Curated annotation (Swiss-Prot):
Gene: htpG
Subunit text: Homodimer.
GO biological process: DNA damage response; protein folding; response to heat
Annotated region (C), positions in chain: 551-622
Classification of source organism: Bacteria, Pseudomonadati, Pseudomonadota, Gammaproteobacteria, Enterobacterales
Region (A): 1-334
Organism: Yersinia pestis
CDD domains for this protein: HATPase_Hsp90-like
Spans annotated as B: 335-550
SUPFAM superfamilies linked: ATPase domain of HSP90 chaperone/DNA topoisomerase II/histidine kinase (SSF55874), HSP90 C-terminal domain (SSF110942), Ribosomal protein S5 domain 2-like (SSF54211)
Full protein name: Chaperone protein HtpG
């Protein structure tokens, strides 16, 4: 062997190998699924590249993966005649993990083995799963179309390093030999291998063949042991739920069953087949900016690309699956997809299909839908801003916490809310805050509790942004309870003659507060919306809200200053006390204290908390 060298694994690979061997052992047979899946991908890539360069087939266009075993040497070998790898590709693919966020992800995994296996499965272990059952793995590979003497040898015991060298390999493709650990003899058994392949790889289009030796004359033949027909090309009636689930695990590299799926063949103006899955759990890097998503794209059953994100809007980036189009050209590129009318029509149809799946799930199985919402609700909340044409459908799928349930769980639909609206109630009331606890205890809710009116409690960072696009539902406008609004005044019975008289008596007090605060507030007024709180701050309907200003700040953007309306409760003892103070210095202390209290309740912070504490201490000891 030429060019031999020993190289160290990237630290993340070492971590992954250690975690995987320990946490996936109870489900160890998946190594076969992962390795056959990789061989299937290699075959897909070769077919695609050969569309423009048929010479890559090297006279052998019958693609397959073969399994053989040697009981004496205790080895299991998988060999494919797919795309193969160059030396640089071997180093990149087998020595490093090129996923951003990998280090943080691996560090976050603890010692809970059941949880770890799910997380690592979610991560996609691929080739490294071989080390679950092998104490040494040998790889021999050559890239399609490259000279025989550019083959590559790779070997490792799955510890700190690996050996790589140049070899001569006549056949293109990749051969992986697993030197099995003690106690793994079950994978040297013909029946056991057939059983695992039938379970995990029956649905893939690549033929999987097993070596059959004639006991009498020692001749070797190869027997195909899977159906080797692309699952999505079969009729729905022929496919079992278990086959659909197994195919999901193959394309998503996930260990868990999907929540739901939809398999459709469409004929007419456009002809295509789609198989779409809703996963049961979010991928570990779903919120990573570099997160890859999208569908597998096939054209006339020929694999074209992974992660074709043009067919699904970003807020549905969690959807896995594939589309097989008869209308797109075989030489389609990502750039062509971007501008294609066919792509836009497919995207629209597939988006509607996913939303229908979610509607059906919500209607038929509320518990499963709640599981979906916990995993992907935050992504779906991006929908009203991103997809105006489906806004009403998305709105029906949203779930919220509410004063009706007295729980932080987001289980209330807008249809639920509307069905419980009080007689004469014209608006859907909501509040946004930093946390569920802050929303639930906000003084803005006092009037609504008194009147028995339900309020939606929104505390996810995205909520304020979402509500700026979600303006109404079934003809009912949304109204933030922290905004000044005439409908809130009506609720508070502001026209009551006794209240008007009390307000008149306090007019000099209100003017005095206005003079003191000046430009720091937009207005000072009395309110009857409060029962237990002396004062609140609100914003005008056309003003930026507190939560939106926080969003701007979190994004590093300069937000316009929020000008609050300072509203005082004339029936509260502290306001009455402040109104009686004649000394200007003490009066200023009272007003500043009431304003700080209102700002603290609204924003959760003060610009000068120490001043607030000093002022409170002075008034308490006065």
């Amino acid at each position: 062997m030429k060019g031999q060298e020993t190289r160290g694994f990237q630290s993340e690979v070492k971590q992954l190998l250690h975690l995987m061997i320990h946490s996936l052992y109870s489900n160890k047979e998946i190594f076969l699924r992962e390795l056959i899946s990789n061989a299937s991908d290699a075959a897909d890539k070769l077919r695609f590249r050969a569309l423009s360069n048929p010479e890559l087939f090297e006279g052998d266009g019958e693609l397959r993966v073969r399994l053989s075993f040697d009981k004496e040497k205790r080895t299991l070998t998988l060999s494919d005649n797919g795309i193969g790898m160059t030396r640089d590709e071997v180093i990149d693919n087998l020595g490093t993990i090129a996923k951003s966020g990998t280090k943080a992800f691996l560090e976050s995994i603890g010692s809970d083995q059941a949880k770890d296996s799910q997380l690592i499965g979610q991560f996609g272990v691929g080739f490294y799963s071989a080390f679950i059952v092998a104490d040494k793995v040998t790889v021999r590979t050559r890239a399609a179309g490259a000279p025989a003497d550019t083959g590559v040898f790779w070997e490792s015991a799955g510890e700190g390093d690996y050996t790589i060298a140049d070899i001569t390999k006549d056949e293109r493709g990749t051969e992986i030999t697993l030197h099995l650990r003690e106690g793994e003899d079950e994978y040297l058994d013909d029946w056991r291998l057939r059983s695992v392949i039938s379970k995990y790889s029956d649905h893939i289009a690549l033929p999987v063949e097993i070596q059959v030796k004639n006991e009498e004359d020692g001749t070797v033949t190869w027997e195909k042991i899977n159906k080797a027909q692309a699952l999505w090309t079969r009729g729905k009636a022929e496919i079992s739920d278990d086959e659909y689930k197994a195919f999901y695990k193959h394309i998503a590299h996930d260990f868990t069953d999907p929540l739901s799926w939809s398999h459709n063949r469409v004929e007419g103006k456009q002809e295509y087949t789609s198989l779409l899955y809703i996963p049961a759990q979010a991928p570990w890097d779903m919120w990573n900016r570099d997160h890859k998503h999208g569908l597998k794209l096939y054209v006339q059953r020929v694999f074209i690309m992974d992660e074709a994100e043009q067919f699904m809007p970003n807020y549905l980036r969690f959807v896995r699956g594939l589309i097989d189009s008869n209308d797109l050209p075989l030489n389609v590129s990502r750039e062509i997809l971007q501008d294609s009318r066919i792509t836009q029509n497919l995207r629209s149809a597939l988006t509607k299909r996913v939303l229908q799946m979610l509607e059906k799930l919500a209607k038929d199985d509320a518990e499963k839908y709640q599981q979906f919402w916990q995993q992907f609700g935050m992504a779906l909340k991006e929908g009203p801003a991103e997809d105006g044409s489906n806004k009403e459908t998305i709105a029906k799928l949203l779930r919220f916490a509410s004063t009706h349930t007295d729980s932080s769980a987001q289980t209330v639909s807008l249809e639920d809310y509307v069905s419980r609206m009080a007689e004469g109630q014209e608006k859907i009331y909501y509040i946004t805050a930093d946390s569920y606890a802050a929303a639930k205890s906000s003084p803005h809710l006092e009037l609504f509790r008194k009147k028995g009116i339900e309020v939606l409690l929104l505390s996810d960072r995205i909520d304020e942004w979402m509500m700026s696009y979600l303006t109404e539902f079934e003809g009912k406008a949304f109204q933030s309870v922290s905004k000044a609004d005439d409908s809130l005044n009506k609720l508070a019975d502001e026209e009551n003659p006794e209240q008007q008289e009390a307000e008149k008596a306090l007019e000099p007090f209100v003017e005095r507060v206005k003079t003191l605060l000046g430009e720091r507030v937009k207005d000072v007024r009395l309110t009857h919306r409060l029962t237990d709180t002396p004062a609140i701050v609100t914003t005008d309907a056309d003003e930026m809200s507190t939560q939106m200003a926080k969003l701007f700040a979190a994004a590093g953007q300069q937000a316009p200053e929020v000008k609050y309306i300072f509203e005082l409760n004339p029936d509260h003892g502290l306001v009455k006390r402040a109104a009686e103070v004649t000394d200007d210095t003490q009066f200023a202390q009272w007003v500043e204290l009431l304003l700080d209290q209102a700002l603290l309740a609204e924003r959760g912070t003060l610009e000068d908390p120490n001043q607030f504490i000093r002022r409170m201490n002075q008034l308490l000891t006065a």
